[in-house]
């Protein structure tokens, strides 16, 4: 049991397959993060410039927000992992409570008049 203490941590803790998997996962997260930055810049450019017509700017930003929300859920909140069942259940139930609440508040406050 004490024989493993003489080895360095990276050699004793992970196999080569685990290291490759972690590197692949880090690479995916960096790519998704860069994609989210790009989506944010696209939404900023939609508002800052007149490239996109004003009537299409709000739906365009909303579409980008939904895409970014889905990417964040799957890659950073680990919704794609199978061993996060309870966390997934709570996040999904939170979405099902939040969306109707926001829609009801928008209707009550008259925000839907553009």
From Swiss-Prot:
Give EC number(s), comma-separated.
Answer: 7.1.1.9
Q: Which Gene Ontology BP terms does the record give?
A: aerobic electron transport chain; electron transport coupled proton transport
Q: What is this protein called?
A: Cytochrome c oxidase subunit 4B
Q: Give the GO molecular function terms.
A: cytochrome bo3 ubiquinol oxidase activity; cytochrome-c oxidase activity
Please give the InterPro entries that the UniProt record associates with this protein. Answer: Cyt_c_oxidase_su4_prok, Cytochrome_c_oxidase_bac_sub4
Write out the catalysed reaction.
Answer: 4 Fe(II)-[cytochrome c] + O2 + 8 H(+)(in) = 4 Fe(III)-[cytochrome c] + 2 H2O + 4 H(+)(out)
Phylogenetic lineage: Bacteria, Bacillati, Bacillota, Bacilli, Bacillales
Name the top EC class: translocase
- Topology term for the membrane: Multi-pass membrane protein
GO cellular component annotations of the record: cytochrome o ubiquinol oxidase complex; plasma membrane
Where does the record place it? Cell membrane
Q: Which family does it belong to?
A: Belongs to the cytochrome c oxidase bacterial subunit 4 family.
Write out the entry's keywords from A to Z. Answer: Cell membrane, Membrane, Translocase, Transmembrane, Transmembrane helix
The source's domain of life comes to Bacteria
Membrane-crossing ranges are: 29-49, 56-76, 89-109
Keyword Translocase set for record: yes
């Amino acid at each position: 049991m004490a024989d493993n203490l003489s080895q360095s941590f990276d050699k004793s803790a992970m196999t080569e397959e685990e290291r490759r998997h972690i590197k692949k996962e880090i690479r995916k997260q960096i790519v998704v993060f860069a994609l989210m930055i790009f989506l944010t810049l696209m939404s900023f450019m939609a508002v800052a410039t007149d490239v996109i017509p004003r009537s299409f700017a709000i739906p365009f930003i909303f579409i980008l927000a939904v895409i970014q929300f889905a990417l964040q859920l799957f890659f950073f909140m680990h919704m794609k992992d199978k061993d996060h069942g309870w966390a997934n259940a709570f996040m999904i139930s939170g979405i099902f409570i939040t969306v109707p609440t926001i829609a009801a508040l928008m209707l009550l406050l008259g925000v839907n008049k553009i």
